[in-house]
Amino acid sequence: MSIKILSESEIKQVANSYQAPAVLFANPKNLYQRRAKRLRDLAQNHPLSDYLLFAADIVESQLSTLEKNPLPPQQLEQLNAIEPLNAKTFKRDSIWREYLTEILDEIKPKANEQIAATIEFLEKASSAELEEMANKLLAQEFNLVSSDKAVFIWAALSLYWLQAAQQIPHNSQVENAENLHHCPVCGSLPVASIVQIGTSQGLRYLHCNLCESEWNLVRAQCTNCNSHDKLEMWSLNEELALVRAETCGSCESYLKMMFQEKDPYVEPVADDLASIFLDIEMEEKGFARSGLNPFIFPAEDA
């Protein structure tokens, strides 16, 4: 990984030099409020409105849990500067299971029969079983956990990682621009990339699907293999083109790119989920998705 989280002494050394931040850290409350509203707005007249509204319910349950049960200060002094909260190696607090219980409690009254069955399964699962499923998901062994359970477990894990990311230094610098495929905070996958407006006008940031951080990657470069060749942009509606898929002919992957200048309310997770028909189109063209949406997990192996 090529983005380093700076210590306090390193922050002081670069304090007088301005450059676009390599990493943007989320504002938890604002993020969940914006995402839930965007999901509900996108659900209007959408063929998959029921699922978008279900996703909005989960996001609102994350917000409610955040407000009722915030993460206490963690012992984070001896972390690596590179991927300090690495999803595969960081020793997580068991409070994430409390978050899962609270999220399930929030969703249960609104659940249909299928979702209710998933909630019941997770409520009856032992702590060891929940931790095992979490380990598989964090190791990116997504095919080993059924997608209906993964959505809830990931929502709780993400709420934990998002808050943990608030407790580490928030300054960073690029050490090597060639290896930016995974989140420099937790090592997880991107959901999509977003081209910013405002002080970061025109810069592209990838959005993490776990800790919700964003990291800068130059445009016209594959987000999966660094190739500058054989890149193409696709969209279902060229007139609007708020959400496009950037495909790479070198590694045959794709990741969506969104443009705030076309809609300042665009939100990576919500708009990625709502543009699932673009995913279908890309897969039909032979491209594999290089990122992961926290509401769309691969099917479990039979």
From Swiss-Prot:
Entry annotated with the keyword Protein transport: no
InterPro entries: FdhE-like_sf, FdhE_C, FdhE_central, FdhE_N, Formate_DH_accessory
A GO CC annotation given for this chain: cytosol
Region forming the signal peptide: none
Pfam families associated with the record: FdhE_C, FdhE_central, FdhE_N
Subcellular location: Cytoplasm
Gene Ontology biological process: protein maturation
GO molecular function: ferric iron binding
Taxonomic superkingdom: Bacteria
Alphabetized UniProt keyword annotations: Cytoplasm
PANTHER family attached to this UniProt entry: PROTEIN FDHE (PTHR37689:SF1)
Cited HAMAP family: FdeH (MF_00611)
Family: Belongs to the FdhE family.
Role according to the record: Necessary for formate dehydrogenase activity.
Name of the protein: Protein FdhE homolog
Source organism of this protein record: Haemophilus influenzae (strain 86-028NP)
